[in-house]
UniProtKB/Swiss-Prot annotation:
Gene label: rps19
Alphabetical UniProt keywords: Chloroplast, Plastid, Ribonucleoprotein, Ribosomal protein, RNA-binding, rRNA-binding
InterPro entries, alphabetized: Ribosomal_uS19, Ribosomal_uS19_bac-type, Ribosomal_uS19_CS, Ribosomal_uS19_SF
One GO MF term: rRNA binding
Coiled coil regions in record: none
UniProt-annotated location(s): Plastid, Chloroplast
Family membership: Belongs to the universal ribosomal protein uS19 family.
Name of the molecule in the record: Small ribosomal subunit protein uS19c
Organism for this UniProt entry: Tetradesmus obliquus (Green alga)
Function: Protein S19 forms a complex with S13 that binds strongly to the 16S ribosomal RNA.
Primary subcellular site in the record, as a coarse category: plastid
HAMAP family (UniProt xref): Ribosomal_uS19
GO biological process, one term: ribosomal small subunit assembly
A single GO cellular-component term on record: mitochondrial small ribosomal subunit
Any one Pfam family match given in the protein's UniProt record, by short name: Ribosomal_S19
Length: 93
């Protein structure tokens, strides 16, 4: 179920305030945030936002194609190391 249009997209208040402040000053600093559930808005285009994935901050450069997605979509939390080639259990003859 999608979010109500009446409510609007969720963006953490502290993140939105920082971005609006940087836009007013014309700065392009790297922002760090733990808010993976914040929606990317058009005012964030051109900024680099470091999103926490549970272990480290992953820098995400926001482009126009990312608008409407969540910040957490671009900072994966799990590392896939690949399947083992010589795994006999996986082969099953």
């Amino acid at each position: 179920m999608t979010r109500s249009i009446k409510k609007g997209p969720f963006v953490a208040d502290h993140l939105l305030k920082k971005i609006e402040k940087f836009n007013a000053q014309g700065q392009k600093k790297v922002l760090t945030t733990w808010s993976r559930s914040s929606t990317i808005l058009p005012v964030m285009i051109g900024h680099t936002i470091s999103t926490y994935n549970g272990r480290e901050f992953i820098p995400v450069f926001v482009t126009d194609q990312m608008v409407g997605h969540k910040l957490g979509e671009f900072a994966p939390t799990r590392t896939f190391k690949g399947h083992v080639k010589s795994d006999k259990k996986a082969k099953r003859r």
